[in-house]
Amino acid sequence: MLPVFISYILSFQVKYIYKASDKYINNNIKTGIYIMRIDSQSIFLTNITYDDTADIVRWRNQKFVQENFIYQKNFTPEIHNKRMQTMVESGQVIQFIIWERKANKKIGSVYLRDIDYQNKKAEFGIFIGEKDYLGKGYGKIATRLIISYAFEKLNLNKIFLRLLTHNKRAFKCYLDCGFIQEGLFKQDVFIKNQPYDVVFMAILSNTPPA
């Protein structure tokens, strides 16, 4: 019988299930805890595995997903597998697949990257890869689940993110989830030889629930 921790955070039921097995990749290096699944009423999150490669590659190469990434080069299975080997398995990245509960369907991914346990911070990222599931609030729920996971279970103090200024839908979602804009970096990146401004947003662990 697996031990279960149930917490009511940000108005969502969040269930963390732990199992000490290397079958599940997202290993909290400091505690040796392996996270299998995080649940809410309408979606659930599971650890990313090599079996998700085809979905990740397909999602990342769709125009409506790719155009909102700062990194917009073609995404390949080789890039994904290298990321798994060098970043996910090392604990630098904790990444989940987002499932829509009713259809039991994979719809996207959410992750924390460059996790810095000393300074208690990490960078946040998310994308919905199935177009029919955009605009239904699933991204917002997944964002809130990861915020609560990062603060409650990883004991982080700050989650930050970067986004291109044209991504208005994501900007509103992040504001609704409690992020605040901390800066605007003018012409910070070049994509296809064109300069783009980048918004920097963050949320702290003592931020009141959104």
Feature-to-residue mapping (PLM):
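N-terminal amphipathic/basic-hydrophobic helices that include classical n-h-c signal peptides
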Residues: M1-I35
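A short, well-structured alpha-helix characteristic of acyl/acetyltransferase catalytic modules
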Residues: I25, K30-K82, T207-A210
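Acetyl-CoA-dependent GNAT
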Residues: K73-D132, L204-N206
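Conserved catalytic-core motifs of GNAT/GCN5-like acyltransferases
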Residues: F160-L163, I180-D197
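Conserved active-site tyrosine of GNAT-family acetyltransferases
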Residues: Y174, F179, M201
